[in-house]
């Protein structure tokens, strides 16, 4: 409720200020008797903009050993969520973006009433770890949902990378309609149609 204010903060400033605040948090937590002799882990998380489809990402973390009032060395995390399709992807996202665009194009060819196919990729150490796809639909009957789900399963197997975990959620105004889940190098995905 009320106004929301946000401004972009570059990673360097976020890390510098986050490390200062983390140290203050450790000092405050250690004042509590029940937290004097336990390890405490603190992570720095970068929140994406309010209108972003993807969540934020952890940038780094550090541990305060039991009984210590300071943090150990910070460990960098090279993790990032990205959304697909991208209009001008960086090199590390290009292959998945191309595959995703082919996947989306196949859906658009046969189901032109689908307005959006939204993908979220999770990258770690600049390598994709998983792909989640959300497809809101406006079909009216169970038979249409079953047919669309079967079609999607085939398109997923032919257009998306085989060595990648992929989860496709089909939703409507009524909630979840179907789920397709494929683990790396599986020939047959798990398919569930909600009743």
State where each predicted segment sits.
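Short amphipathic alpha-helix segments
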Residues: 101-113
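Short edge beta-strands and adjacent turn/loop segments
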Residues: 1, 111-137
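Short, non-transmembrane amphipathic alpha-helical segments
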Residues: 8-34, 143-165
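Extended, H/D-rich, highly charged conserved domains that either
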Residues: 28-39, 52-54
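Acidic/histidine-rich, surface-exposed loop or edge segments in extracytoplasmic proteins
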Residues: 1-10, 77-89, 129-136
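A short amphipathic beta-strand at an alpha->beta junction
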Residues: 33-47, 159-182
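Aromatic/basic-lined ligand-recognition segments
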Residues: 46-95, 101
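C-terminal region signature
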Residues: 180-195
């Amino acid at each position: 409720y009320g106004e929301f204010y946000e401004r972009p903060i570059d990673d360097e400033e976020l890390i510098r200020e986050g490390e200062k605040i983390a140290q203050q948090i450790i000092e405050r937590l250690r004042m509590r008797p029940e937290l004097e002799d336990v390890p405490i882990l603190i992570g720095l998380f970068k929140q994406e903009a309010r209108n972003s489809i993807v969540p934020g990402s952890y940038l780094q973390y550090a541990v305060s050993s039991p009984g210590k009032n300071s943090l150990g060395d910070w460990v960098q995390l090279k993790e990032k969520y990205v959304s697909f399709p991208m209009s001008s992807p960086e090199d590390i996202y290009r292959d998945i973006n191309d595959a995703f665009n082919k996947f989306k194009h196949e859906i658009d060819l046969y189901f032109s009433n689908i307005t959006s196919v939204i993908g979220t990729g999770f990258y770690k150490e600049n390598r994709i770890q998983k792909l989640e796809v959300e497809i809101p639909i406006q079909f009216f009957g169970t038979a249409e949902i079953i047919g669309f789900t079967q079609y999607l399963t085939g398109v997923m197997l032919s257009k998306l990378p085989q060595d990648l975990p992929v989860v496709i959620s089909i939703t409507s105004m009524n909630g979840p309609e179907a789920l397709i889940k494929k683990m790396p190098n599986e020939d047959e995905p798990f398919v569930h149609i909600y009743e």
